[in-house]
Amino acid sequence: MWFPEPVGFAATDLAALVTGETGADLHVVLAPQAEWHDSEAQTDADKRLAELRSRYDGPTRSVDDPELADVAELLSQPPHACYGWFSDGSQHLSALAAGSSWFGLIAIRDGDEIWVRTFRPQRLSTVLADVLPHDHVRSNAQPVTVLRSELLEARKTGLARNSAVRQAERIIADPPLVSAELYGEQRDRNGRHRCEFPLRVYDTATGRWALQISKHYDEERWDLSAATTARVADLLDGLHSRQDA
């Protein structure tokens, strides 16, 4: 079951295929809303599922290619993954980049369809970051670090405590053309481990900005920095590092 080019599936059909193979749900970033079918609709769904099984649940073309069970595992309970939601205000996508020791996949949900592509081992963070638009304004602005309480105080009083808060306010006030919320995830015998705070990415008229949130005593620290796609991938890898710590 090898997809060097994206192959499309109805989200509900892929969810049924994965659950039937693994006993687990499709990954949360891809999973469609549960539906109840009458007997006729259920018969049609069962027929589509049987057709998918007939097409994909058989001998692989090469001993190096994954079987249906291998692909289904990465689509439901991957050992390593990063994923997220993307929006430009009109189009909303969600994506999962997942990998094992010998292959990986990228699955992108667009409405009721999910497109799946497989690949030999690659850096998952790079694969997911590549979902972001390639065409974006580049900024040379210096990174800025503030506390969430400082921003709330400035919003309440109209007075910024320092230049860092003023710069952060300017960045945050710029309407996003594209926004993304990205997570890192690992799974082991003790279950699924997701980063506590997502990496947020905003494409604006003044540049692409990455927002990292972390704990600072009983506060939230906000790190805002100009970012390229490569930088977003590096920051995603950092989410994994914090899970391992």
Question: Where is each model-derived feature located?
Answer:
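Short, surface-exposed polybasic-aromatic patches that bind anionic ligands, especially phosphate groups
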Residues: 1-245
